[in-house]
Amino acid sequence: MGLPQEHRLKRRKDFQKVYKQGGRYTSPHLIIRTLFESCSENSLNSQPTCFGISVSQKVSKKAVIRNRIKRLIRQAIRELLPQISNGWKVVIVIRPGSVECKYDRFLRELKQLLIKAEIINGHQREYIL
């Protein structure tokens, strides 16, 4: 089971916008880039939070390993989705050296970064940054 369609960040221009305008939070194995975007007229109907995952060849030359890491990250996102507030665009970048990392470690680091970025347990924003 993959990440629901409405929670996927796919287009190149969306990734670029998050990289240029968003904030950056780091941990030993992950980097997240975040950008808050919401409908200006009604914050109750804001867009769901979208996630993009980037695993470069610096992490591993083998696509099988990169895809396994992406599956682990998607599973961690699915587990955290009920706690995540709406209106965010998040790009998760996997750092080199994460090949040996287990699911529990990814989940713990991702949750800590999302809390730090106020995407989990953060206040609901009613304005556009």
Curated annotation (Swiss-Prot):
Keyword Nucleotide-binding among UniProt keywords: no
Protein's recorded name: Ribonuclease P protein component
EC number of this enzyme: 3.1.26.5
GO CC annotation: ribonuclease P complex
One BP annotation, GO: tRNA 5'-leader removal
UniProt entry tagged with the keyword tRNA processing: yes
Subunit organization: Consists of a catalytic RNA component (M1 or rnpB) and a protein subunit.
Keywords, sorted A to Z: Endonuclease, Hydrolase, Nuclease, RNA-binding, tRNA processing
Gene3D superfamilies with a match to the protein in the record: 3.30.230.10
Coiled coil: none
Gene: rnpA
Catalytic reaction annotation: Endonucleolytic cleavage of RNA, removing 5'-extranucleotides from tRNA precursor
Entry's Gene Ontology molecular function annotations: 3'-tRNA processing endoribonuclease activity; ribonuclease P activity; tRNA binding
Protein family per UniProt: Belongs to the RnpA family.
Signal peptide: none
Role: RNaseP catalyzes the removal of the 5'-leader sequence from pre-tRNA to produce the mature 5'-terminus. It can also cleave other RNA substrates such as 4.5S RNA. The protein component plays an auxiliary but essential role in vivo by binding to the 5'-leader sequence and broadening the substrate specificity of the ribozyme.
